[in-house]
Amino acid sequence: MATSLKNLSDYDKNTIPNGADFSIGIVVSEWNDHITSKLLAGAVTTLIESGVKEENIQLKRVPGAFELPLAAQWLAQTNVDGIIAIGVVIQGETRHFDFVCSGTTNGIMEVNLKYDKPVAFCLLTDNTEQQSIDRAGGKHGNK
C-alpha cells in the first residue's frame, strides 16, 4: 500500500499558500473520537502554521461519518472558503462499512459540486483500528 511508503505528515510547507485571508470550516465525527481528535488536532495545527487565524476556523461536530456531508453543507452555506471533513470508518463484520463509506463519499462529493467550495476528504476507511491509529499521528504520520 502506498501509505507504507510515505509519512503522510511529510510535505513541503513552502508549497502551501499563506492562509491569512482564508476562513476554514472543519466538520469532525465523534465516532472513533480517540482517532478523529488526533486528525482534528493535526488539521488545526497545519492551518495555523499556514497562517489561518484561529478565529477563522469554524468547527462542527457530528455523531458519525454519515453525518459529515450534511454538516459540510451547513458550513458551505456560510462564508467559509473551504471545508475539511474528518471521520473514521473501520471495517466490521457486516456490510454497514460499505454503505457508510459510499454514502459519506458521495455526499461530500455532492457538497463540493453544489457549492463550488473545496471539501477536503479526510475520511479514514481502514480494515482495522490500528491502521486508523497509524494514520492519525501514528507511524504513518497524520493524514
Language-model segments: which ranges?
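N-terminal amphipathic/basic leader segments beginning at the initiator methionine
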Residues: 1-20
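Generic secondary-structure signature for well-ordered alpha-helical cores
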Residues: 3, 33, 45-53, 73-81, ...
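Glycine-rich phosphate/diphosphate-binding loop of Rossmann-like nucleotide-binding domains
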Residues: 14-62
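Structural motif
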Residues: 25, 58, 81-83, 117-123
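Short, ordered loop/turn segments at secondary-structure junctions
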Residues: 30-31, 88-89, 124-128
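Glycine-rich oxoanion-binding loops at beta->alpha junctions
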Residues: 60-77, 124, 128-129
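Glycine-rich phosphate-binding loop
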Residues: 67-108
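C-terminal binding/interaction regions
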Residues: 97-98, 102-143
